[in-house]
């Protein structure tokens, strides 16, 4: 496998009805994290840390440009404040995909002084399934 850029990647997010919507065109940037919890179990007899690996997690923040056409970003996220459903987020790049059941907890719009209208949507792992690239 070669080193690659993120150009040409795809992100799909379920709308509140469970239909996957590819909204890559509306997303300008994103960040995701797949951390693992750790517990320090160092005994008094140790001179270095001893740890246990704990639960897996997933979080994502999608950022984009406002688009209120049908079945794109605004249609997907405008229901976040009123409908509490887990949404499948699928990130795909170079044949690799990372699907996760995600709760989005905000859909924030920002109108900058220069005029642009952008949005941000942070989400967290919902289903208890370990995030796994396939």
Regions found by a protein language model. Name each.
Residues 1-66, 96-122:
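Solvent-exposed edge beta-strands and adjacent loop segments
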Residues 2-4, 130-134:
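Short hydrophobic/aromatic patches at helix-to-coil boundaries
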Residues 65-70, 126-130:
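Acidic glycine-/aspartate-rich tracts in secreted/extracellular proteins
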Residues 71-105:
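Short, acidic/charged, Gly/Pro-enriched secondary-structure junctions
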Residues 118-132:
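Short solvent-exposed strand/turn elements
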